């Protein structure tokens, strides 16, 4: 018998009243087992053909499940409003922390939490002009808590991976199971990507009249496990795929080396770690383009997102977001955050230590992250010693129980696994905020490891 708690965490039970679920069930019952197996095989083949999900370092490649994740219109409106608010809030926080730092002066954020953070980059102070948004792109990872409510457990701004996967998955579904997509009325993604193209084309607004803006996607290259996603996304957006070695700084701007000479770069979609972007001002051992920060500083380059944004990814803001939202927006946080604690506060440290296996621990000066249950006894003892030696260096984020979603593949047939969603937001001073009308859904039999990936 299904318990009350498990009912709260069953996505399928939430779908029973949706007309899309009725359409899906009707379609499902019309398919033979053999045809479902063939459709699943065709989906995986289509992914291999497109290439975005290819990872040469993985023995087992990603699989696309045959069952879509349904979200009601009411639920989606709530998620959309929450992501828009969150992106604006985080952008304002970064603008302050890399600017006047009033949030620290007013005691809303502890100074040691920010300045000890590996992802807080001093060279990025006053990097972005006040009229521009710090976070043009944001990925928000959500899952359900014990009450069945969606909560954010992580934000991704440094390299918000997954846009290419969502796009590729939708194209594969349209190609292989177009009639199902049509019957359940999936929202179209094209409008979001057109707006993304427009934001990059407008860049800083300083492009010389008559010159077509040059936009690029900056990647580490083939050694990056996500390189094929980068190539797929750049091709779809009709922007150049660039590497640091392709670029040079000259006359206050960033230039692309081509066989016909130098061409000024106006906008970059950055999929390169913050510290590896500029060998002059950031990591001198990296192959980053010297002068990249200066070109942003001089408003000759629009970068999404600029180096320094990874402070958001470190999780240090999570314990303070409700108070920050009240202070900066005079609003309640629309999309709640998983319970998070800064261990530099004694009462919060004791709360974490009393139930440490229920948390994901992050060390802010090294960006290391641990799940207690994945450590052996010696590793647990070593981590506990680190935690007690300097608790100000640790953030603890409570693990969510997560909901389980119906799945189907050719090897297991119909079954259920834990699931999370990654949503994507777009923010620009020229346009109204936008949330991609879809999400990257990930599933796993292990709820904890899913939140740690």
What residue ranges belong to the model's regions?
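Preference for protein termini
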Residues: 1-453
């Amino acid at each position: 018998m299904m318990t009350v708690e498990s009912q709260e965490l069953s996505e399928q039970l939430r779908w029973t009243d949706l007309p899309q679920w009725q359409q899906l069930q009707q379609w499902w019952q019309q398919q033979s087992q053999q045809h479902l197996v063939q459709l699943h095989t065709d989906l995986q083949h289509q992914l291999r053909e497109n290439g975005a999900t290819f990872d040469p370092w993985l023995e087992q490649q990603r699989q696309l499940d045959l069952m879509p994740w349904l979200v009601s219109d009411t639920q989606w409106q709530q998620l959309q409003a929450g992501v828009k608010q969150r992106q604006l809030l985080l952008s304002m926080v970064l603008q302050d922390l890399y600017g006047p730092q009033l949030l620290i002066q007013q005691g809303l954020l502890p100074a040691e939490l920010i300045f000890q953070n590996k992802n807080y980059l001093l060279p990025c102070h006053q990097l972005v002009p006040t009229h521009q948004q710090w976070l043009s792109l944001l990925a928000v990872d959500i899952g359900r808590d014990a009450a069945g409510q969606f909560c954010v457990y992580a934000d991704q701004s440094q390299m918000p991976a997954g846009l290419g996967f969502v796009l590729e998955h939708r194209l594969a579904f349209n190609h292989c199971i177009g009639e199902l997509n049509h019957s359940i009325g999936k929202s179209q993604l094209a409008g979001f990507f057109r707006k993304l193209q427009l934001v990059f084309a407008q860049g800083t607004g300083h492009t010389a009249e008559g010159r077509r803006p040059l936009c690029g996607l900056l990647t580490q290259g083939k050694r990056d496990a996500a390189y094929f996603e980068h190539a797929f996304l750049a091709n779809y957006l009709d922007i150049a795929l660039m590497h640091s070695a392709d670029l040079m700084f000259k006359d206050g701007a960033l230039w692309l080396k081509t066989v016909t000479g130098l061409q000024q770069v106006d906008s970059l979609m950055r999929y390169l770690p913050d510290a590896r972007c500029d060998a002059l001002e950031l990591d001198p051992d990296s192959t980053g383009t010297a002068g990249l920060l200066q070109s942003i500083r001089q408003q000759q380059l629009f970068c999404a997102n600029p180096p320094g944004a990874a402070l958001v990814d470190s999780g240090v803001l999570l314990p303070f977001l409700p108070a920050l939202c009240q202070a900066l927006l005079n609003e309640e946080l629309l999309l709640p955050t998983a319970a998070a604690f800064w261990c530099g506060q004694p009462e919060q440290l004791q709360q974490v230590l009393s139930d440490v296996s229920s948390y994901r621990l992050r060390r802010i000066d090294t960006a290391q992250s641990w799940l207690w249950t994945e450590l052996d006894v010696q590793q647990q003892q070593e981590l506990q010693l680190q935690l007690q030696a300097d608790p100000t260096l640790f953030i603890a984020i409570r693990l969510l129980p997560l909901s389980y979603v119906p799945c189907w593949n050719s090897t297991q047939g119909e079954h259920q696994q834990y699931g999370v969603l990654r949503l994507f937001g777009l923010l620009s001073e020229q346009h109204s905020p936008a949330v991609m009308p879809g999400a990257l859904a990930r599933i796993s039999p292990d709820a904890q490891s899913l939140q740690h990936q």
